[in-house]
């Protein structure tokens, strides 16, 4: 593609590469979904079919390394980078083990130069990496795995519980998915730092966001910016009229939902987030709140606290659809939450897990201006305080660890 002397030749190799990458992803991840959906559509008009479906295990992390490859090809096509002649360097870029199965989604322009330069051991970088790994393990093992036990129990049998308990289950899943995914990202970034590699940041305290637009600038940052650079902007971005902005916003959120999995729940989840962000797009306020909340202050204002609470509730509502097994379950789950049973005493109230969540959120708030929460320990804290904190976190990992749960994003 790079050496093609004609535009048509360049386009041929470009679209061939795009087709091969997306073809593998579509075949393994979406074939059964489309086959079943097509059969359901035919049954509505009276035709009964038994579609052939795949009985294969989805390759772990296929959505992530497919996007690595796509960004590489697109950047070459746009003349942002030159093709990598060293096959080993290219292979490491696509399959660097810390990010292979669950991201972050790297760019060739960011990672390849780091792989090609000579690296030297950096004690400060190593120490910082170990701290981030420690915090990631705490988030995954202590918060996410404990929340998962109760979230799974409630979501698997929603008909057995009152609306108040279903709300508790939704809150548990809200913290589970954040601590599970951001915990993995912390471990990946910390591990890469041990090898002298700086990966893209993937989370920036999203639950302290004051609106949905800010939330999506802070949640799964590598995916959000990927869709912005390789889909939203090529579609015209925000340069066209209001209708173009609305259309492009819906496209990226629907595609983002579909990227997560072959289930209508993910597509509806993407559409919900597009609806939530639409008032900000229409009013031109989607670029507000670029800095972290309460910058340089310990406490937020009442207005900021209210905005964070409202955004958190909208996010929790969307996570219900994301977690549900199907659209019918999501609808019944939400309908029951907004029934009179919401005002009953919850049947599931694990005080120990709730206390752990509160402590966790206080630490996150304390360190929200840093790349990760406990990075602040290395800035001004005396050595005895730092080591006491590290050992306390390590002890919590062993003492308060929940039942082992697979990382949620391994399925994507």
Q: Which residues fall in each region the model found?
A:
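Membrane-embedded transmembrane alpha-helical bundles that form the catalytic cores
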Residues: 1-411
């Amino acid at each position: 593609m790079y050496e093609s002397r004609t535009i048509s030749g360049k386009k041929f190799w470009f679209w061939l590469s795009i087709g091969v990458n997306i073809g593998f992803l579509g075949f393994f991840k979406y074939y059964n979904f489309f086959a079943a959906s097509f059969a359901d559509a035919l049954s509505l008009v009276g035709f009964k079919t038994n579609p052939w479906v795949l009985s294969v295990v989805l390759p772990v992390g296929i959505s992530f390394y497919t996007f690595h490859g796509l960004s590489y090809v697109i950047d070459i096509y746009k003349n942002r980078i030159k093709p990598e002649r060293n096959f080993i360097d290219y292979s490491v870029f696509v399959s660097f083990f810390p990010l292979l199965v669950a991201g972050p989604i790297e760019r060739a322009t960011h990672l390849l130069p780091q792989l090609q330069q000579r690296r030297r051991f950096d004690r400060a970088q190593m120490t910082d990496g170990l701290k981030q790994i420690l915090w990631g393990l705490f988030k995954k093992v202590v918060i996410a795995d404990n929340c998962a036990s109760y979230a799974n129990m409630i979501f698997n049998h929603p008909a057995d519980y009152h609306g108040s308990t279903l709300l508790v289950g939704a809150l548990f899943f809200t913290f589970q998915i954040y601590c599970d995914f951001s915990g993995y990202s912390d471990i990946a970034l910390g591990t890469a730092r041990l090898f002298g590699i700086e990966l893209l940041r993937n989370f920036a305290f999203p639950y302290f966001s004051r609106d949905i637009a800010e939330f999506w600038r802070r949640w799964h940052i590598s995916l959000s910016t990927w869709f912005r650079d390789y889909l939203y902007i090529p579609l015209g971005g925000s340069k066209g009229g209001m209708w173009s902005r609305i259309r492009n916003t819906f496209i990226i959120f629907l595609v983002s939902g579909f990227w997560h999995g072959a289930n209508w729940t993910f597509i509806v989840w993407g559409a919900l987030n597009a609806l939530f962000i639409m008032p900000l797009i229409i009013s031109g306020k989607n670029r507000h709140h670029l800095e972290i909340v309460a910058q340089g202050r310990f406490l937020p204002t009442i207005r900021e606290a209210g905005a964070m609470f409202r955004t958190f509730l909208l996010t929790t509502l969307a996570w219900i659809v994301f977690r549900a097994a199907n659209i019918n379950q999501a609808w019944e789950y939400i309908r029951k939450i907004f029934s009179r049973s919401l005002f009953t005493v919850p049947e599931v109230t694990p005080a120990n897990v709730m206390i752990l969540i509160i402590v966790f959120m206080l630490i996150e708030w304390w360190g929200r201006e840093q790349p990760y929460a406990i990075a602040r320990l290395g800035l001004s804290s005396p050595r005895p305080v730092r080591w006491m904190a590290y050992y306390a976190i390590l002890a919590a990992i062993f003492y308060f660890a929940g039942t082992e749960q697979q990382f949620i994003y391994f399925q994507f």
